[in-house]
């Protein structure tokens, strides 16, 4: 199919900012179907998303910070009510979820380039199908999309090489970040990162989702589309392989010292 214009989307996460650039997409099929096309067997209305930048989040001060309330906001409103009027915009999706998606993508893929690609593809897929999303757990949906994209990538490429995070990379903490913490989180050590690299992709995904992202076994099962017993087995075997790897390499390091 020939396109009049191609959509170019780029997500860049790290160095305390995430920048999204989306160019207009139009094609003959869209015109023929009166503004609708089909992606992944789901009808999607063609939408033009404006450029988005999160760099302005660096400018937050204590006086700008709004205390959290019990009332749902942003995507939580849409998730809780299913109200189409509350459907999040591209800007809202990115602002609220980009860093968390990138964090998961990095832990799964182990390197910045693949993490950026996975983050980009996740948000493109989310934005194209958000109109068909059934209210439930929005973050769980993001976990599922990101993880499945990672596993698809691994199957295509074979083995993914893990790399340590750059020394100057900061990450968002898991819960209730304040302005000074919003782009800061702890990093995994190089040894643990290398140990994760040694795991089969399915084990790695289960361990990352459980021990780093903090998902329950039930949530991991829903994310990976496997039974609870399979989740337990993958996590158990993955942890055992991590212990074996770390013990072996710790011994080798001690002998060479």
UniProtKB/Swiss-Prot annotation:
The keyword Aminoacyl-tRNA synthetase does not apply. Signal peptide: none annotated. InterPro entries: RNA_pol_sigma-70-like (IPR039425), RNA_pol_sigma-70_dom (IPR014284), RNA_pol_sigma70_r2 (IPR007627), RNA_pol_sigma70_r4_t2 (IPR013249), RNA_pol_sigma_r2 (IPR013325), RNA_pol_sigma_r3/r4-like (IPR013324), WH-like_DNA-bd_sf (IPR036388). A motif (Polymerase core binding) lies at residues 111-114. GO terms for biological process: DNA-templated transcription initiation. Pfam families: Sigma70_r2, Sigma70_r4_2. One of its GO terms (molecular function) is DNA binding. Residues 186-236 are annotated as: Sigma-70 factor domain-4. Keywords: DNA-binding, Sigma factor, Transcription, Transcription regulation. Residues 87-153 are annotated as: Sigma-70 factor domain-2. Disruption phenotype: Reduced survival after heat shock (50 degrees Celsius), treatment at pH 4.0, exposure to detergent and oxidative stress (5 mM H(2)O(2)). Additionally an inducible protective response to oxidative stress present in the wild type was absent in the mutant. Residues 211-230 bind DNA. Sigma factors are initiation factors that promote the attachment of RNA polymerase to specific initiation sites and are then released. Extracytoplasmic function (ECF) sigma factors are held in an inactive form by an anti-sigma factor until released. The sigma-70 factor domain-2 mediates sequence-specific interaction with the -10 element in promoter DNA, and plays an important role in melting the double-stranded DNA and the formation of the transcription bubble. The sigma-70 factor domain-2 mediates interaction with the RNA polymerase subunits RpoB and RpoC. The sigma-70 factor domain-4 contains a helix-turn-helix (H-T-H) motif that mediates interaction with the -35 element in promoter DNA. The domain also mediates interaction with the RNA polymerase subunit RpoA. Interactions between sigma-70 factor domain-4 and anti-sigma factors prevents interaction of sigma factors with the RNA polymerase catalytic core. Belongs to the sigma-70 factor family. ECF subfamily. Interacts transiently with the RNA polymerase catalytic core formed by RpoA, RpoB, RpoC and RpoZ (2 alpha, 1 beta, 1 beta' and 1 omega subunit) to form the RNA polymerase holoenzyme that can initiate transcription. Interacts (via sigma-70 factor domain 4) with RseA; interaction is abrogated by treatment of cells with H(2)O(2) or detergent. This is ECF RNA polymerase sigma factor SigE.
């Amino acid at each position: 199919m020939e396109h009049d214009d191609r959509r170019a989307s780029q997500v860049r996460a790290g160095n305390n900012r995430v920048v999204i650039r989306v160019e207009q997409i139009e094609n003959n099929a869209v015109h023929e179907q009166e503004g609708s096309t089909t992606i992944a067997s789901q009808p999607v209305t063609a939408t033009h998303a404006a450029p988005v930048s999160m760099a302005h989040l660096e400018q937050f001060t204590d006086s700008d910070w709004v205390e959290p309330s019990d009332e749902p906001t942003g995507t939580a409103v849409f998730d809780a009510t299913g109200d189409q009027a509350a459907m999040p915009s591209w800007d809202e999706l990115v602002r609220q979820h980009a860093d968390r998606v990138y964090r998961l993508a990095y832990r799964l893929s182990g390197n910045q380039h693949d993490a950026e690609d996975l983050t980009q593809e996740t948000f493109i897929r989310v934005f194209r199908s958000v109109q068909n999303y059934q209210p439930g757990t929005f973050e769980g949906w993001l976990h599922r999309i990101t993880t499945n994209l990672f596993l698809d990538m691994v199957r295509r490429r074979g083995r993914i090489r893990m790399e340590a995070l750059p020394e100057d990379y900061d990450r968002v903490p898991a819960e209730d970040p304040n302005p000074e913490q919003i782009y800061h989180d702890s990093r995994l050590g190089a040894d643990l990162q290398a140990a994760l690299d040694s795991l089969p992709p399915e084990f790695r995904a289960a361990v990352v989702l459980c021990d780093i992202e903090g998902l329950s076994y039930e949530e991991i099962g829903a994310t990976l589309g496997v039974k609870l017993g399979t989740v337990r087995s993958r996590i158990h075997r993955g942890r055992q392989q991590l212990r074996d790897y770390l013990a072996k390499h710790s011994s080798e390091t001690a002998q060479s010292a």
